[in-house]
Design a protein with these regions (language model features):
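Intrinsic disorder at enzyme termini
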Residues: 1-68
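A broad, structural surface signal
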Residues: 3, 10-14, 78, 82, ...
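Short Asp/Glu-rich motifs
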Residues: 20-21, 96, 146
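Short, surface-exposed, charge-dense and proline/glycine-enriched linear segments
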Residues: 39-49, 116-128
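Short, flexible, mixed-charge glycine/proline-rich loop motifs
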Residues: 60-76, 114-121
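Short recognition patches in nucleic-acid-associated and regulatory proteins
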Residues: 82-120, 140-141, 152
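Short, compact, well-ordered microdomains
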Residues: 118-154
Length: 154
């Protein structure tokens, strides 16, 4: 990724928690520490995160499950089971959101004003329970959070 300039060394650390040494090699121990620190910083601090113990009935994405809890269907973090709301809701509204400059998504973007009028942003959505990255989106700064998944399960 870094060699192909898909992400810079800085973005690898900031976005993915991957530590790339000056010589281009990966620092596995440093990456483990960085990711643990990032996840700890992203969790909801008010203690209001409910963990679901119900059966996983669907794997929506690598990071998002649907669980049946007390007869109702909820989105949940695939890593820790944190409740991300009923399936009728936008799961992103139950995540911790961080909005970054668009260049954080890709170092090759350059000056966005050359291509579009409205300021774009790079949004990242984290599990409020464990801090794992759940989803990314690129949007205009004034756009509402994208509802990228609609589920109809019974």
């Amino acid at each position: 990724m870094v060699e192909g300039r898909a992400v810079s060394r800085e973005a690898a650390r900031e976005i993915y928690g991957v530590i790339v040494r000056e010589d281009g090699s990966l620092d596995a121990d440093g990456t483990k520490r960085e990711r643990a620190g990032q996840r700890a910083a992203r969790v909801r601090k008010d203690g209001s995160v409910k963990t679901l113990a119900g059966k996983v009935i669907a794997k929506v994405t690598e990071n998002l499950d649907v669980r049946k809890e007390n007869g109702s269907l909820h989105c949940a973090c695939a890593k820790c089971g944190a409740d991300l709301g009923p399936i009728r809701d936008n799961y992103k509204e139950h995540c911790v959101m961080e909005e970054r400059e668009i260049t954080a998504a890709n170092p090759n973007i350059g000056d966005w004003k050359r291509y579009i009028d409205d300021k774009p942003v790079f949004r990242q959505f984290y599990c409020p329970g464990c801090g794992a990255l759940v989803e990314n989106e690129v949007a205009r700064a004034d756009d509402p959070v994208l509802r990228d998944i609609e589920l109809q399960l019974h």
